[in-house]
Regions:
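Extreme N-terminal starter segment of soluble prokaryotic enzymes
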Residues: 1-2
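A glycine-/small-polar-enriched, mobile loop at the entrance of the PLP active site in fold-type I
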Residues: 27-35, 48-67
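PLP-dependent class I/II
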Residues: 6-8, 16-27, 32-48, 79-372
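Conserved N-terminal alpha-helix of the aminotransferase class I/II PLP-enzyme fold
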Residues: 57-90
Length: 372
């Protein structure tokens, strides 16, 4: 067995979700998956594409028409690019895997600001590289120059930025991004931007892809899953310098060949479907959850995007995993321990649930902590 795989850790998110599902009557606030169905025009486009016979191999990079549509989408959002800068992938997970595997050599290092989505560490480990963690809790979840510079070494190959962030919902400030840009140029490493929540953020998100001087070192990962409620479709993309895309394509060709053709046709339609209505629902749910947490006396970093809140539970005198196990067993509610993200002392709550589910779940949380 590959030693790198033996060093990989199972997903704590999946583990606590499975525990909740095996517990009768347990509610869940664990999953970061839109509760909406994929918009009908997208589903109809997929059915039409199959009926039209678009069921054969697609090019390894993706169809020209989808890559051109994605390039136009990114250009409209501020990242000027052409289809030569785009690779269609199997979701953002595929994009992250291809990008990190494509740039890393064994023994090199990737800086991961934490709390962070645990997948980043898993991919880095599988590639035979090392994760170097930059804890943002003491800096109000922003990146400070001295702290970042302290973890940069000659082995540093990349930094992963996820803004809005999973699990906190926090957005990196322009000052944080300026710091990353300056040090990436000084020390010559890539900036991997996981932007899967940007389209659903409540406020405008500062973005390094707008900085022309960084175009040769910024790699953007994006997904159809979150903005268009297409998690099961497994569609995403990479945007990067053309020479990197060419190399990434060789890697993807060896892994999956290509993304299904009829799904790519439906993805073209998705790019034309507004996400403003779903974003408005998420904002409403966010404000409701925050108001309830305020009433419970729980503090949290202010989320400005994504669909998570990361309340502090350290005052209850137990670690986050113990808290979440007891919450399931005694409170009938599942959350994800902050330790799964490198954020001990917190839990992650998702508001990708109906108003009724949120109300009942937060009632359960309130009853649980009132009895501690």
């Amino acid at each position: 067995m590959n030693r790198n795989i033996l060093n990989m850790k199972p997903s704590g998110i999946r583990r606590f979700t499975a525990l909740a599902r095996s517990t009768p009557g347990c509610n869940m606030l664990t999953i970061g998956e839109p509760d909406f169905d994929t918009p009908e025009p997208i589903r109809e486009a997929a059915a039409s594409a199959m009926a039209d016979g678009l069921t054969h191999y697609a090019p390894n990079k993706g169809t020209d028409s989808l890559r051109a549509a994605i390039a136009a989408y990114e250009t409209n959002r501020g990242m000027a690019c052409t289809m030569d800068n785009i690779l269609v992938t199997v979701g953002a997970t595929g994009a992250l895997n291809t990008a990190l595997t494509g740039i890393l050599n064994p023994g090199e290092e990737v800086i991961i600001p934490i709390p962070a989505f645990p997948l980043y560490e898993s991919i880095v480990t599988a590639a035979g590289a090392s994760s170097v963690f930059l804890d943002l809790k003491k800096s109000n979840f922003q990146i400070e120059k001295a702290a970042l510079e302290a973890v940069i070494t000659p082995k540093t190959r990349a930094i992963v930025l996820n803004s809005p962030n999973n699990p906190t919902g926090c957005v990196l400030s322009r000052e944080s991004l300026k710091t990353v840009a300056e040090l990436a140029e000084k020390h010559d490493f890539y900036i991997l931007c996981d932007n899967v929540y940007a389209a659903l953020s409540a406020e405008a998100v500062p973005d390094l892809t707008l900085c022309r001087s960084l175009r040769d070192r910024v790699i953007l990962c994006q997904s159809f899953s979150k903005p268009w409620a297409m998690t099961g479709w497994r569609l995403g993309w990479l945007a990067a310098p053309a020479e990197l895309i060419d190399k990434f394509t060789l890697l993807q060709a060896a892994q999956i060949a290509s993304v299904p053709t009829f799904l790519q046709k439906a993805a073209e339609t998705a790019l034309e479907v507004p996400v403003t209505d779903m974003a408005a629902v998420y904002r409403k749910r966010r404000e409701y959850m925050l108001s309830r947490l305020d009433q419970m006396g729980l503090t949290y970093p202010r989320p400005e995007g994504a669909f998570y809140v990361f309340p502090d539970i350290s005052r209850f005198g137990m670690d986050s995993e113990t808290f979440c196990i007891r919450l399931i067993e005694e409170g009938g509610l599942a959350a994800v321990p902050g330790s799964c993200f490198g954020g001990e002392g917190h839990i992650r709550l998702s508001y990708c649930y109906s108003d009724e589910e949120l109300r009942e779940s937060l009632d359960r949380l309130e009853r649980f902590i009132s009895n501690l």
